[in-house]
């Protein structure tokens, strides 16, 4: 455990940030995995799942969980399966 007051505050802040970010990151990863699984299985509701995954990626980017280029790259890779 940290002894210095500023280090104690950082521990509290880091935990708070983690508790806020982790559910959003999990939702983003789940949406992408659900789409990839459906694409591998050849299901026909890919357009709908792509829309959900794309929205989750955009949300993760707007919350600062992933960078702009990663969001664009992920969406581009997923879009190849929709065609």
From Swiss-Prot:
Keyword list, A-Z: Ribonucleoprotein, Ribosomal protein, RNA-binding, rRNA-binding
GO molecular-function terms, A-Z: small ribosomal subunit rRNA binding; structural constituent of ribosome
Pfam name, any one:
Ribosomal_S20p
What's a GO cellular component annotated to this UniProt protein?
small ribosomal subunit
Q: Which GO terms describe its biological process?
A: translation
The cross-references to SUPFAM superfamilies, in alphabetical order and at most eight, read: Ribosomal protein S20
Sorted alphabetically, which Gene3D superfamilies does this protein's record hold? Ribosomal protein S20
State whether keyword DNA damage applies: no
Which InterPro entries has this protein been placed in? Ribosomal_bS20, Ribosomal_bS20_sf
- What function does this protein fulfil? Binds directly to 16S ribosomal RNA.
Q: Which family does it belong to?
A: Belongs to the bacterial ribosomal protein bS20 family.
- Supply the name of the protein: Small ribosomal subunit protein bS20
């Amino acid at each position: 455990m940290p002894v210095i007051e500023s280090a104690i505050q950082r521990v509290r802040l880091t935990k708070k940030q983690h508790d806020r970010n982790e559910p959003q990151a999990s939702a983003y990863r789940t949406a992408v995995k659900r789409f990839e699984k459906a694409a591998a299985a050849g299901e026909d509701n890919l357009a709908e799942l792509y829309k959900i995954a794309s929205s989750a990626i955009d949300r993760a980017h707007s919350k600062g969980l992933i960078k702009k280029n990663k969001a664009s790259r992920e969406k581009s890779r997923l879009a190849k399966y929709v065609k």
